[in-house]
Amino acid sequence: MADAESQNGENHLPHKIYLDYNATTPPATEVVKAVEEALREAWGNPSSSYTAGCKAKELIDTARAHVAKMVGGKPEDIIFTSGGTEANNMVLFSTVENFNSTSKERQNNRVALALPHIITSNVEHDSVALPLLHLQKTHRAEITFVPVSTVTGRIEVEDIISAVRPNTCLVSIMLANNETGVIMPVGELSQCLASMSKERSAQGLPKILLHTDAAQALGKVEVDVQELGVNYLTIVGHKFYGPRIGALYVRGLGQHSSLLPMLYGGGQERNFRPGTENTPMIAGLGKAAELVFLHCAVYEAHMRRIRDYLEERLEAVFEDRIRLNSRFPGAERLPNTCNVSLLKPAMLGHEWLSHCQYLQASIGAACHSDRGDRPSPVLLNSGVPQEAATSAVRLSVGRETSQDDVDLIVRDLEQAAQLLGVNKKSLKKLP
């Protein structure tokens, strides 16, 4: 996607090309319109009975229905949050609190379990990994970080099942990785956990709930909570052309899946997330979800075609001087994600990007942008060699990225590599 930079006179320079859609996306035109209309017409308190308040409540109800439809759930199972970080934290801390609140009942059944045990992977987003490390450090939970396969880049179901203990109460596995694009076998995992539940229940052991952070998957591939079989699913608006708020899907909220509030206040969102609702942003999220529900297959096909073309051009130009880090045998991946390293000469990923004139991309997760010269732990944990991980660049295409955009940024990357000392004769010239 070319940005809106101005051009001077007849000097028609190429625009900047944004290829960091895994970090964030621009709000869709329809989303901006929905937000603006809500600001003008639905500024009232949704709990009030006057016109502007009733309009706000109507917009919130409509948005909730659209978000639920996008993930194949029910409107009553959707809780609006400030974003993915809050949604993830709600699940993790609720699980610990609920485990502790039911410990007396288990003791009466002569099943004494000291601390709750949570299983996750070693490639999770910081909004999952860091709260879990905090719970571990403060001796409030036992945490197991299961390594992903260094062959497939994905978590293996049997490794998760092998990590289950009597006190296991939650498994949290992302639906798709933000750096490699690898899609995790969450649906298969839920089936295995469900088959264990009857035996565990007979033994008086806690039910194992399943959470997935779907931030990277939504808007790129179809996401259906019925097929996934999850108890919790995290939704992040700004990853699919919506505003920077989020939502949490909770299967059978209050019945099949427990949730406790992190905040206490006015009772909004059925007391699970109090505070006067952010109507304009919720309306925007609902519109973004509606667009995904209607057009996801089209978005996916376009992004896959452009991503594949991008990788073809990179291989044609750089040949064996690059490594495509997001290609793992036997693993599915997001249709828009390409993680690539320039190996000859060895260089840091951010150095390569800094010499590009038109490309706007990143070396990985935005929350790790301050890691300096250190390679991505996610890539290392996924089996990417140290040299490649150090020089990695993440290119993620969007709904409007074109082949012309790809041609320009591949040429840009080639010229940047040349500036960094790559022998021009060793590279094929672009036509």
UniProtKB/Swiss-Prot annotation:
Coiled-coil segments: none
Reactions accelerated catalytically: L-selenocysteine + AH2 = hydrogenselenide + L-alanine + A + H(+)
Signal peptide: none
Record keywords, A-Z: Cytoplasm, Lyase, Pyridoxal phosphate, Transferase
GO CC field: cytosol
Keyword Chloroplast among UniProt keywords: no
Active site positions, chain numbering: C367 (s-selanylcysteine intermediate)
PANTHER family: CYSTEINE DESULFURYLASE FAMILY MEMBER, SELENOCYSTEINE LYASE
Family, per entry: Belongs to the class-V pyridoxal-phosphate-dependent aminotransferase family.
Subunit comment: Homodimer.
Protein name: Selenocysteine lyase
Organism: Xenopus tropicalis
Name of the gene this protein is made from: scly
